[in-house]
């Protein structure tokens, strides 16, 4: 439903095409990154957007990684590479980001809203269900 609201095609990994020139992985799950290696085409690029912190991520770098000559590239949202920094000023990048956020389709990503004062109690609710399993919250907006 979210992909449709954003105007994007969606497929489960088992149903996805196995010849993508670019695979963007952002699940934060090592198994998802492993799946990304199988979805990329020959000489394809896997753009890893997940943050694992100090978690060790096992990744099969034999098999398809070498035979398909894949490129694994990381993304860091906290900084702009020196090679690209001169293209746009900080103000230009901020203006672009804010204009992109004005797209009403992004409202599909908001799965709830709460006041800031409720945040301490809300964090437990947002991170787990009563059974202790992760909850399906994508982006919970906090009102300040």
Task: Show which residues each predicted segment covers.
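C-terminal hydrophobic helical "lid"/dimerization subdomain
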Residues: 88-144
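Short, surface-exposed connector motifs at secondary-structure boundaries
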Residues: 17-20, 41-47, 104-106
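Generic hydrophobic alpha-helical scaffold/packing signal
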Residues: 21-24, 37, 62, 98, ...
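Adenosine-nucleotide cofactor-binding segment
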Residues: 1-35
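Conserved beta-strand termini and adjacent loop/short-helix elements that scaffold enzyme active sites
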Residues: 11-15, 75, 112, 143
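Glycine-rich phosphate-binding loop and adjacent beta-alpha segment
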Residues: 34-99, 144
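Glycine- and other small-residue-rich loops at beta-strand/loop junctions that grip anionic moieties
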Residues: 21-25, 49-51, 86, 111-112
């Amino acid at each position: 439903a979210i992909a449709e609201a954003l105007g994007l095609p969606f497929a489960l990994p088992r149903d996805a095409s196995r010849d993508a020139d670019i695979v963007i992985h952002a699940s934060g799950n090592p198994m998802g990154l492993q799946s990304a290696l199988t979805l990329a085409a020959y000489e394809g690029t896997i753009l890893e957007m997940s943050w694992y912190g100090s978690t060790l991520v096992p990744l099969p770098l034999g098999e398809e990684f070498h035979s398909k000559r894949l490129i694994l590239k990381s993304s860091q949202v906290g900084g702009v590479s020196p090679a690209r920094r001169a293209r746009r000023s900080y103000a230009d990048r901020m203006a672009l980001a804010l204009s992109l956020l004005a797209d009403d389709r992004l409202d599909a990503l908001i799965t709830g809203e709460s006041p800031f004062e409720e945040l301490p109690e809300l964090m437990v609710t947002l991170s787990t269900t009563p059974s202790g399993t992760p909850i399906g919250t994508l982006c919970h907006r906090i009102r300040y």
